[in-house]
């Protein structure tokens, strides 16, 4: 570290930023214009004037960063139009919103995402007007050229291959098909479909060699290549990985120009300092940590694990087979180095890990240079002649087709993706300390061997073999520490799904989903329920219970069934339970078809049925066999009584009216009540509450909502029976855990314990 003061400065700078943010100093927080605060809270539609600074194409719309007129702050504009010029003065009319922090564990962090773009608000535009197109703008010229390049690639290649090459060369992921993106993700190759540091380095070095071949002096060629890559970075968009790669390449070329030795870790540290100084919120961005983590693995971890340099390893190797074996060993060591750093980051940000990523990555590493160079050459040729470009791109098409077939094959392997859950912060810290400590020990021993080669030779290969074995055993236990997930004795989590219901019940290894749907949140299964399950490390649901067929209780479940049937998730569902009165009706058809496609068994619940799992007993109190609730589905909701030790909970769906009267005689006193029908005044009567006497009442609804849930009359009844009320509009996701003889309630704004009585 003494020889790398830039690394020390970077670590110190990051530590200061972390401490300041913990202390509440708003570093990296975008300026929040007061004139938009109230309008955002009310969801009002407004006219906003400003100048467009940047543009990015998205899959379903177009994104612009807008600097407001007469304002210090920026606003992110989501518009259907994709032809608003960068640098233009515009007026837009739409709904202004303030990004929210996630209200469920695992949910997309909208606030952090927009902070990374420097925006405190975003506007969903309905109408745009260009007031002044402005003068010639470099950013707009580069955007138009990038769109032209994407169009040319589409002409020269099939859609899938054109989308992949557009992502690799132009940073344009919007051209990727959903199937391609998913296949690369499940094969551990997601880093390839973006402009990474490796891509930029290959293209930059190729440009430098070309300039030197044209007899440009070494210094001039290096500086020109650096300038070219800066322009290329502006051309493809200044993402985290791009900015980091451009800075590192510029430092490398600068070192060549002045005759100094290039040090990748020092260049990496400089890039981190520059980026964090410009926007400290990068510390909370996944792209920042993944990009810098990958380079740290290659530049810092690999040299230590590899021991001697590759050139020294191959000294004396005569045959081509020996050289091939050495290269294979080197590739395996690079992959191991990457995984040691990237696995905890993948677990932290994505909650799942591809288990069979080695072969696709090995193949990709072997062909990526050829893909990028022939792809770039083909694109340049295609800009002059589509036919000529198509010929040049033939090798690229062939290699990308092979890569696509390999990713598709790997994605089909059962158990390819492991849902591991998100580690705790102490687990991440423990893993990092162990890995760093081992690397320091190996580095010190390596230095001693280099300083005393005769002594190292006497000790021989056995000593190094013992070192590797000790390293492997220690890292195995570090991984056990990282992925340890204690099982819940008993817990119920009411997810915040807006106007809807979704409850996750855990007891030991048993996990049950009771309802899952929303009438106010879109894609609730994919964007709220599934991320929570993955964050918790739940790879399989033993039971999914549909209380009744209303969409605000079921559309998320149907999404999960569809994702499983199309093999778009590693989640598994073992049993799907429907109320017995739905059997043979039209309302069961969507569930039957989706379950059959996903290979899931469908069963029916009636009064008297039980599910037992360890200490947990799930008793069905309603509906009875032979009863028909067609036309009054709420009254026919499945009602479950959960018993675990001395703790009981009652899950009621949308129970009301005649259904509530039937349950009244069978229900017992419960500590936990899931309040029926989102807190409607027509459910959970006074007589019902006197029978149940719940200590804790959970309400799932949207606020403000068109139904006015929870109703004042219902809240008064709950307060009258001295029940503690928790609602998803206030607390976000609410979890009730059984801890020995106490119930602990955890929400975003509550953390309380009650004795079980």
Model feature map: region roles:
Residues 116-248, 253, 337-340, 543-545, ...:
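Aromatic-rich juxtamembrane segments at the membrane interface
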